[in-house]
Each structure stands twice: as C-alpha cells, then as structure tokens.
Amino acid sequence: MIYISEFIGRHVEVIQSSNRYDVGISGQVSFETKNTFEITKGTGKVIVPKEGRIFTFDGKFKVDGSLINYRPEDRLREYRKILKKLGGN
C-alpha cells in the first residue's frame, strides 16, 4: 500500500491543489515532514504542503495528501486510520 511507503527518493507530481500555482510541480522528494514534502526540481528545491493536494508518485500511484499528513515514521502506526479513511475495513 503506497500510503504507508517511504516517499523520499520517489518522483512526485502535484496533480490537484487548492493553490493553482502548485499544480504541475514535479521532481524528486528529498525531504519529508508531517505536513510537507521538499521536492528537488532542476537546480532548486520547493516545499509543498500535503494538505489539500493530490500527488502522483512514480507516474502511477495517486495519493491524497490529506491522508498522509503524518510524520513518515508514524504512518505505519496510523495504518488503520488511513485504511478507514480510504473506505477499507
């Protein structure tokens, strides 16, 4: 399940956002906090909030940023909450 995976090192693109200027930002995730991704693109870095955005990872996995709004080390512990929000068991 991509929602509990490690995102650092993956290619990411913002495909939907409450801020229209964020749509289309893409690059490699170089750092992650509870609320943000640091995306390396070209020669610069951009910090993008997770909340209110939908991302694609590696060009195939669509992820709602609101559901991964946890510290990376806490996502596995919060697996049941994430699954419930996704409509699973």
Curated annotation (Swiss-Prot):
Intracellular or extracellular location(s): Cytoplasm
Transcription regulation among keywords: no
Enzyme class: hydrolase
Reactions it catalyzes: Endonucleolytic cleavage of RNA, removing 5'-extranucleotides from tRNA precursor
GO cellular component terms, A-Z: cytoplasm; ribonuclease P complex
Signal sequence, renumbered to the chain: none
Enzyme Commission number, as recorded: 3.1.26.5
Complex and partners: Consists of a catalytic RNA component and at least 4-5 protein subunits.
Free-text function comment from the UniProt entry: Part of ribonuclease P, a protein complex that generates mature tRNA molecules by cleaving their 5'-ends.
The name this protein goes by in its record: Ribonuclease P protein component 1
Organism: Thermoplasma volcanium (strain ATCC 51530 / DSM 4299 / JCM 9571 / NBRC 15438 / GSS1)
Lineage summary: Archaea, Methanobacteriati, Thermoplasmatota, Thermoplasmata, Thermoplasmatales
